[in-house]
């Protein structure tokens, strides 16, 4: 089962999900390990990230709507400072 799902959502879909009311997270250019205790959905507002997993590497850029599944262990490589809306589901 894929633990990283990258999609493009329309403005209407984002509005229906209430993304604009979600929290905001920012991070400067860096690298760090991360694991997910629950599912997270996020909309990348700015930046460029590579997420390295056992399944492979994922390139994530602004405009991507990403779901990180519970149990995922990965390494984030923030290539350009990132800003995202996020929500744990």
Which residues make up each language-model segment?
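Conserved short histidine dyad/triad with adjacent acidic residue
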Residues: 9-11, 18-37, 69-70
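Ligand-binding loop in jelly-roll beta-barrel domains
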Residues: 70-89
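Cytosolic regulatory regions built on CNB/CRP/Popeye-like sensor folds
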Residues: 2-9, 14, 22-23, 57, ...
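Short, conserved beta-strand element in jelly-roll/cupin
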Residues: 37-50
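Short histidine-centered beta-strand/loop micro-motifs
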Residues: 32-36, 53, 77
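Double-stranded beta-helix
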Residues: 1-3, 17, 83-89
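Short acidic-glycine-tyrosine-enriched beta hairpin
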Residues: 54-70
